Design a protein with these regions (language model features):
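Extracellular and analogous surface-interaction loops
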Residues: 44-55, 94-99
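Short proline/glycine-enriched turn/loop motifs at strand-loop junctions of beta-rich domains
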Residues: 62-67, 111-113
Length: 123
């Protein structure tokens, strides 16, 4: 009888651990599109909850004209990433440690033509 209780307790703990890790792994923000001489600014917000300890940023940009700016701000208001991309290709991956809370990403385009995708994942 005691063995069954221990096995059941271990199974419950394992399920809780998997649930918590799945919550962090699948907590993400994604945006992407094709652009044609586009000038606009997007403000994207996403909140990471505990047990996330930070975020991973993936940027893929392929522009034939214009510029794109990507800015990432963490929950404390600290600017974690700020870069302007011109015509060409860029594939960036950055990891940031920070408290949980609302992250803000600004993606601004000026006469941009091409494709882009940005992804922010809790870690």
């Amino acid at each position: 009888m005691a063995r069954h209780r221990i096995a059941l307790a271990l199974a419950v703990v394992s399920l809780l651990a998997l649930s918590a890790s799945a919550k962090v792994w699948y907590s993400m923000l994604w945006d992407g599109d094709s652009l044609s001489n586009t000038t606009k600014t997007k403000v994207l917000k996403h909140t990471f909850a505990s047990p996330a300890a930070g975020a991973r940023l993936n940027i893929n940009v392929k522009l034939t004209a214009g510029t794109a700016v990507v800015r990432l701000t963490d929950p404390s208001g600290t600017k974690r990433y700020d870069k302007e991309f011109s015509a060409g290709r860029a594939n960036i991956e950055e990891t940031f440690k920070a408290p949980t809370g609302e992250w803000q990403m600004v993606v601004a385009f000026r006469n941009a033509t091409g494709d882009y995708s940005v992804k922010l994942t809790g870690i």
